[in-house]
Swiss-Prot record:
Family, similarity comment: Belongs to the long-chain O-acyltransferase family.
Key words, A-Z: Acyltransferase, Glycerol metabolism, Lipid biosynthesis, Lipid metabolism, Transferase
Active site annotation, chain numbering: H174
Annotated GO MF terms: diacylglycerol O-acyltransferase activity; O-acyltransferase activity
Naturally occurring in which organism (per UniProt): Mycobacterium tuberculosis (strain ATCC 25618 / H37Rv)
Pfam families: WS_DGAT_C, WS_DGAT_cat
SUPFAM superfamilies, sorted: CoA-dependent acyltransferases (SSF52777)
Protein name: Putative diacyglycerol O-acyltransferase Rv1760
């Protein structure tokens, strides 16, 4: 192993000489120093992907085409997308790897990039309502992306109930974006005016050949012992602090403490979705009424909707549900990578019958969970995953399906709240009326609920597997009911009162 490797992005002479000694010799391209390597967390979503677990981040947009300059045609839409993508290199980058690479893959420019490889067109069946749109989008969500091309697709869905509308589904691999980065990527295709000129083209970072990828990978691999020497003490300290917190009752929900539900089980290859939309003014009224945060209200809405759904099916657990919640650390982490998030576990107390007590319990629990997550730090998870590779995570994916979840799943669902723009946006010239985010399913948690705000509305996207939950509209329709309940319920219960169903 060569010595003298100090970083993970540039290849040192020792690495180049080491590889040259193996008979690997290729010219160095001028742009290879800018080659971007996936972080461990980025690559995690590649390594954990299986045919029954596609790890894509999606969003469904409802567009008013009457604002498109010149009028909407698919050809104009295609041409507009082509112009905007030229200004966003992320849309033109694909994975590159080699068997000699000891680190994670890299992003390089796709020299054969063509919009037609990524843009699809499909007609919505009659009558063109939300159920027909959801059926198409659920099918698309379950399709894998082609890893030989940039990891995204856009589907234009025409033929809705109104002639001046189309729906668009954008699907991007989780290795490319997390929730916040996905919103930023989407913004590259938006403007504040329908006739805004397309941005100027931006050059990509170039490519990388076998030697370049292997050399910089060898450098990163050689630096792992140094990084491990830092991570292990930090982990030990975190474990000690967590034990002390547990003695005082100041920890987030523990993994594998979740009750069994109908949406916890082995995942199939298919996906189904449902969605709904709420008025952000009402959400903020609930926030102000109870003196809580928007995140607390989102969890309370989820708890109320799931309570209604589980009660209707006679399977409401006596214990609180447990959600894993991604927490953005884009403004707190100095680690490289597209995905800048950690996770926390929060309780979703659907067993509490009184909505006022339910949201107060949620607010108190979330305060503890956020404090615990902050104590763990924004980079510990990222640092540990950095050491994992395809072999380790592949073995995990072979083992996990055989772990019994009859009594206590690791968690019941994934719950995410992504902040969105509070302005009227135009997507390639079309007015964006609604946006519904859709997250992936992971492990044996067959339910993902993601919300995102847009111009005074809160879009709620729900994803599951039809093998577990054949019909999600009962969950989606529970959100407006849960919001109404929080707006109208009495709040005269004494502090600490906890009404539960027996």
């Amino acid at each position: 192993m060569p010595r003298g490797c100090a970083g993970a992005r540039f290849a040192c002479n020792a690495c180049l000489n080491f590889l040259a000694g193996l008979g690997i010799s290729e010219p160095i391209s001028p742009g290879w120093a800018a080659m971007e390597r996936l972080s461990g967390l980025d690559a995690f979503f590649l390594y954990m992907e299986t045919p029954s677990q596609p790890l894509n981040v999606c969003c469904v947009l409802e567009l008013d085409t009457s604002t498109m300059p010149g009028g909407y045609t698919y050809g104009r839409f295609h041409a507009a997308l082509e112009k905007y993508v030229k200004a966003a290199p992320e849309f033109r980058m694909k994975l590159a790897d080699t068997e000699l690479n000891l680190d994670h893959p890299v992003w390089v420019d796709d020299d054969n990039f063509q919009i037609r490889h990524h843009l699809r067109r499909v007609a919505m069946p009659a009558p063109g309502g939300r159920r027909e749109l959801a059926e198409i989008c659920g099918y698309i969500a379950g399709l894998p992306l082609d890893r030989d091309r940039p990891l995204w697709e856009m589907w234009v869905i025409e033929g809705g109930a109104r002639s001046d509308t189309v729906a668009v589904m954008l699907k991007v691999h989780h290795a490319v974006v997390d929730g916040v980065a996905g919103a930023n990527l989407l913004s590259h295709l938006c403007s504040l005016q329908p006739d805004a000129p397309a941005p100027q083209p931006v050059r990509g970072t170039g490519g990388g050949n076998v030697l370049q990828i292997a050399a910089s990978g060898l450098e990163g691999f050689a630096s792992r012992p140094v990084r491990l020497a830092t991570v292990v003490p930090a982990t030990v300290l975190t474990l000690v602090r967590t034990l002390l917190r547990a003695r005082e009752g100041r920890t987030m929900a523990a993994p594998f403490s979740a009750p069994p539900t109908p949406f916890n089980g082995p995942l199939g290859r298919l996906r189904n979705i449902a969605y709904t939309q709420l008025d952000m003014r009402d959400v903020k009224r609930v926030k102000d009424r109870f003196g809580v945060t928007i995140n607390d209200v989102v969890v309370a809405l989820c708890a109320g909707a799931l309570r209604r759904f589980l009660l209707e099916h006679g399977v409401l657990p006596e214990a609180p549900l447990v959600a894993t919640v991604p927490v953005s650390v884009h403004d707190k982490s100095d680690r490289p990578g597209r995905n800048q998030a950690t996770w926390m576990f929060c309780r979703v107390p659907s067993q509490i019958s009184d909505p006022a007590q339910r949201i107060r319990t949620i607010a108190a629990g979330n305060t503890v969970a956020k404090d615990h997550a902050a104590a763990i730090g924004p980079t510990l998870l990222h640092d540990w995953i950095q050491f994992g590779g395809s072999t380790m995570f592949g073995a995990a994916m072979r083992i996990l399906p055989h772990i019994s979840i009859t009594h206590s799943p690791a968690y019941n669902l994934i719950l995410s709240n992504v902040p969105g723009p509070q302005a009227q946006l135009y997507f390639l010239g079309c007015r964006m009326d609604s946006m519904f985010p859709l997250g992936p399913l992971l492990g044996n948690a067959g339910l993902n609920i993601t919300v995102m705000s847009l111009n005074g509305e809160l879009g709620v996207g729900i994803v599951s597997c039809p093998d577990l939950l054949p019909d999600l509209w009962g969950v989606a329709d529970g959100f407006p009911e849960a919001l109404k309940e929080l707006l109208e319920c009495s709040d005269d219960q004494p502090e600490g009162s906890n009404h539960q169903d027996s």
